[in-house]
Each structure stands twice: as structure tokens, then as C-alpha cells.
């Protein structure tokens, strides 16, 4: 008998005897959520059942405690929930049934749907800085005035729950916070982090997410250099421009002030004396722009485009800009550049 004919006869026998695989690992489903299982209140999410076997009836159900609620049964293997409410938070599974069989498949994996935005958002900060050299350590701190029982830190689908909470008083206001330690960091740690809070009686109902915190991993490439105007004498009110130069032709250049993005990034750099240079204008020379600046370079295959940070930056030496303010007599700013060390700005009295 031909092999194809044997296969057809065996399949027919299987269906007629209703002994096709059921409740077995080989026909177990998987359940997924698009675009994410973490959904903002009032948002939209699509749940989809997947299986390599051809089922004709699909059921998606929600489990709350020991009770199951059927959400969808039909020919379609997916359902869209919109708008999402707190009642949609919980655990979901799905099953399927053959057209000529009487038993359901095994249940799919459990999928937790989290609804965010039910409480005021916490804050998030990095210590000592969100700019972290490869191999170093950093702590992310989630902080809230609401007495949450737990904080959740997440980045692009990776979720981490707090193990311990600290409490305290600040300016007469009670707060709770959790500290998440990371390190030694690698390029995989780079990205935009957020945190949420929740209460123990409703762990699938989270607060609004914090503002994103971009963790940048530095030190992959040779560092550029940072300098200011060639003229060493600068008066208050004059235009201040910083020059970021490198031997490497980076696709983007970024300026940071006191470890925080200065709100500027430039695409590429112009060829200048055997190097590539990007020019940053930081406004007029007043006491406000003064401070410590750094510039970084990156490539398009690891772009820095706030709020998402995925790149490896190379740091340069620090440029410290010190601006002095006086109307009479006027003060001049002298800039002394030191290679591979913080540059020094010296304010001197004009002896006119």
C-alpha cells in the first residue's frame, strides 16, 4: 500500500474513533497579547491563540481566583479588547476543539494582562547616574508618596518585582521606595526603564508608569574630545559654542550637562583637520549654561533617540565651563584645555 494512502486511512480511523490527541503536550496552545500584556487603562489589546494543529473552535477565558469566565468562543483564534477596564486585569488561557472530536485540547500557557494607570505614577531615578560605564554598577530607585505594597521595574517586556520596600519622611510627607541594583552592566542593560506601583490585593492593577529613564552604557569606542571657542577671553552675553571632535566618523553626537541630556543631538559631523566635528550651540554665556559638559558619539545601528536608549556611547574628557557674573568691573573667562583631563575655566578681573 502506498505511504500516502496509509496516512489518509490512519487519519480517518483517528477521527472516527475520536482518539486524536487531546489534553496532551503535543497540541498545547500558546496565548499572546499584542502589542503588549501591559495595557494602559482605556487602551486596546488583542489576545491570540496559536497552535500548529488545525482547530475549528477556539475559546479564550479569564481566570479570577478559582472561577473562570469565558471571554470568547468561535471560529476566530483571537479577540480584541477595547477599551480596557480594571475588570480585564487577570490571567487568561485558551483551548481548542477538533471539528469531529468531542474533547478539547490541553490548556494554553497562562497569560497575565496588566492594566496600568489606576493610580498616580511614581518617580524613577538612577544613582549615581544614568550614564553608566560598561562593567560598572547602577541603582534604579522607584519612589512614591502612595503606600504601595510593591514596585515593578520594566523595560521592553522585561519585568522585575521589588523584593523589599523602604519607608521614610520627606518634608513632612510619607513615602515608600524600592531600589533595583544592576551590574556589572553590559550593552544589554541599555534602554528606557519605567516603574509602576501596585497593592497586594490587586497585583494586576498597576499605577500609571513613571516617566522613562534612559540608561546609557558608555565606553565601547575611543572617546572624542570636547572644547570651546579658540579665543580664550569670553565675556558674559557672548555666544557659547562647544565642539565635539573624534577620529571616528560617528553617525550622531550627543551633549550632556551634569550627566543629563542637554536636549541636543546632531547627525554626523563635518570633516575638520583630520577629525570629525559636531558643533553645539548652548546659547549666550550667562551663569545659567555654566557647568560640566560631556559629549558622546554613537552609530545608527544603536541609535540614541529619546525616550528609547539602546546605544553604547564613548565618553570624552570633561569640559567644565565656569561663567562669572559682574557688571562693574567686567569679568573675562579664560579657558585652559587639558588633554584627557577636566578642562579648566578661570575667571579673571578685566584690568581696563
Swiss-Prot record:
InterPro entries: Ig-like_dom, Ig-like_dom_sf, Ig-like_fold, Ig-like_Receptors_ImmuneReg, Ig_sub, Immunoglobulin_dom. The keyword Cell cycle does not apply. One of its GO terms (cellular component) is extracellular region. Keywords: Disulfide bond, Glycoprotein, Immunoglobulin domain, Repeat, Secreted, Signal. Expressed in NK-cells. Residues 1-16 form the signal peptide. Disulfide bonds join 49-94, 244-295. The keyword Signal applies. It is found in: Secreted. Pfam families: ig. Its main location: secreted. Glycans are attached at residue 78. Residues 17-112, 224-311 form the Ig-like C2-type domain. The gene is KIR3DX1. This is Putative killer cell immunoglobulin-like receptor-like protein KIR3DX1. GO terms for biological process: cell surface receptor signaling pathway; immune response-regulating signaling pathway.
